[in-house]
Each structure stands twice: as C-alpha cells, then as structure tokens.
C-alpha cells in the first residue's frame, strides 16, 4: 500500500525513503535525524557527503547512497507495494500504529503483508521458548484462544515453539494475530512457518517487518525486532522461558516501554520455567488464569468475556462422577493423553476444573 492519503508524500519521496532505508549502518534514529536535518529523504540523498559527516553519520552510509544495489532494492520494494495486500506504514503518517510510535526507536518504515488496520487494535504479545515442552505449547494455545476470544490481537515473532502455538491458536477461534519477523518479508524465516504465515494473511491477520524485503536472517536482528513485538502491545505474556531466553529481552523492553509484563510460573525443577520465575521476582504479574490479564487491561476496550467450554464437556462430566488422574481420564474418555492434557488446561483456565494432589476435580 502506498500511503492511504497519497497526497502526503510524492512517488519520488517514497522511492527516496526506500533508498535511505537500505543504507548500511543507518538505523531508525539516524534515519529520522536525516529527515529532520534536510526536511525530506530526497534532499538527504542529494546532500554532499560533508553534510552527512557533520551530522556524525558514518562514511559507509553516505557512500552507498547511489549504489546499484540500493537503487535496485528500492525499485523492487515499489513493485512489491503495487501488489494486493502489501503495504508500507511510515512513522510520520497517521496510519502508523500509535503505541509503536511512542517508543524511542520506532521503525521509520514498516512493511506489512495482510491487513495493516489490525496494528491499531488492542494487542497482547505472547512469547516463550523455541524448544517449548508439550505442556508449555498447550498452555500457550489455551491462553491464546481465550485472549483472542476476548478481543485481543495476539502478537508474536512467528518463531518455532511458543510463538507458533500462539499464532495458530488465535486463528483457530477466528481471532487475529500479528507476526513480527526478524528478516525481510521476502526472506521468510523460519521456513517451517511459511504456511502458517500465509494462513494468517489469508484470514485477515498480518505479518510485518522493519527490515528491507530481501534482508536475510542475521542473529542480531531477532533481538532487535523484539522491541516491535512489545511496542505494538499493551502487555507481554511470557509462557515458558529459560533464564537465557530471548523472551526475557522482550519482557525487559516491554517494561522499559511502560507495558505490562505477565509470566506463567512452572515447576521449580523445569529449566524452561526459570526465566518466568525470574520475571515474577522482578515484578512481573504472576498469571494462572486469563482473568489475571483481563483485570489489568479491561479498560482498554469493551472486552467480551472468553467463551467458556460448555459445562457438558465430556471430561467435566467424568470428573463430576469422581476425581481422576490425567491418565485415568484418557482411559475413561478414550482420548489420547496429549488431547486430554490440552483440554484440561483450557478447562482449568475457564475455572471448570482444578488439580489437587495429582487428581482432577470438577468445580461446582
């Protein structure tokens, strides 16, 4: 999408911004410094190298302005924007997400595949381990379904593990979800989630990136994109994370940006719970049910309550008859244990069941 109000910026200025965006060692703050100093990207590109040096900008940035690679990349981006459902949001235009605009290093340009309007909707970020346990994945999916049903857009990084579970679960209940990439949109990573990303776009959600379309995976870009995940959101929920997890970076950034930080506790013997426990010690809200999140964010919009599972759920009926262990429920219901555990997690979130001393009971 060219800017919604096309009178705000000329085609020449748009191309100039895309060229500026591709220059090496030119991050968000330097990008805006150039626009402020010269008034527009077109004038910044034509300014003498000495003027760039006077602003403290590196020589490598100025020298690359007229390179073939920079020009070709900008032309390719213009062609990409001409296709359906492919958009560009700019930091100085009214369509840019208001919450994201508040952070110090908001990306000046944001490429969007899908529906850009959902970036303005109330969002809750969900992050966690790429190597999540099965219970961790089930917990992420259960919370995502409930939060999406309550009206939140679920925002995450489209990584393996918790991210993917959160995105997929939101789609399953007809919710919307945003994936923030650490690569360009044309260099999708991880490839295993390409189909998930396509489903998100097809179902009215979005995939976004601040990087040039052809930017390949680089280790340093993934922590950098985390500030966008937190910056778009009202709060960040960490589901399962070790003490060295990148999810803790997102949580730290969220706190610095004035966002809420939530963490789900786990077993003291589980290494992937130690990061969440550290966050709780540092002041994150300990979350056991969705109500712990909704209580703090209810004022942002008229949220509907999550749709509860019906009281006649087969597992609830079995538990009304007598308490059962998870394994006994699997045998009695004829369902796989993994499916039973996932259902029990959702039922517990809805307040219909409770686990005491290893046995599940139905709540009256």
Model regions: which residues?
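Short, small/acidic-rich helices and loops at N termini and domain boundaries
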Residues: 1-95, 326, 350-358, 362-364
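Glycine-biased, small-residue-rich flexible motifs in mid-sequence functional cores and linkers
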Residues: 2-13, 90-364
């Amino acid at each position: 999408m060219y800017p919604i109000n096309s009178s705000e910026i000329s085609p020449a200025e748009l191309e100039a911004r895309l060229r500026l965006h591709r220059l090496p060692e030119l991050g968000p703050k330097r990008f805006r410094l150039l626009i402020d100093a010269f008034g527009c990207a077109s004038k910044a590109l034509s300014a003498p190298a000495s003027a760039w040096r006077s602003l403290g900008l590196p020589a490598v940035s100025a020298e690359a302005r007229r390179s073939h690679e920079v020009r070709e990349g900008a032309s390719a981006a213009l062609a990409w924007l001409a296709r359906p459902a492919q958009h560009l949001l700019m930091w100085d235009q009214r369509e840019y997400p208001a919450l994201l605009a508040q952070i110090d290093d908001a990306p000046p340009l944001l490429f969007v595949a899908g529906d850009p309007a959902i970036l303005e909707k109330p969002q809750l970020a969900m992050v966690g381990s790429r190597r999540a346990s099965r219970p961790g994945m089930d917990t992420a999916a259960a919370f995502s379904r409930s939060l999406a049903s309550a009206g939140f857009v679920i925002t995450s990084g489209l990584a393996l593990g918790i991210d993917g579970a959160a995105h997929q679960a939101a789609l399953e209940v007809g919710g919307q979800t945003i994936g923030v990439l650490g690569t360009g949109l044309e260099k999708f990573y991880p490839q295993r989630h390409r189909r998930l990303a396509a489903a998100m776009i097809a179902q009215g959600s979005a995939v976004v990136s601040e990087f040039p379309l052809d930017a390949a995976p680089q280790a340093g870009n993934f922590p950098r994109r985390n500030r966008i995940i937190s910056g778009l959101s009202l709060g960040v929920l960490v589901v399962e994370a070790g003490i060295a997890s990148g999810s803790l970076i997102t949580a730290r950034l969220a706190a610095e940006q004035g966002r809420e930080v939530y963490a789900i506790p786990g077993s003291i013997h589980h290494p992937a719970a130690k990061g969440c426990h550290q966050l709780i010690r540092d002041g994150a809200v300990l979350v056991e049910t969705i109500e712990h999140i909704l209580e703090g964010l209810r004022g942002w919009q008229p949220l509907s309550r999550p749709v509860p599972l019906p009281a006649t759920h087969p597992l609830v009926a079995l538990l009304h008859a007598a308490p059962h262990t998870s394994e006994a429920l699997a045998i009695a219901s004829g369902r796989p244990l993994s499916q039973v555990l996932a259902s029990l997690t959702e039922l517990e979130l809805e307040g219909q069941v409770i686990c005491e001393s290893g046995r599940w009971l139905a709540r009256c």
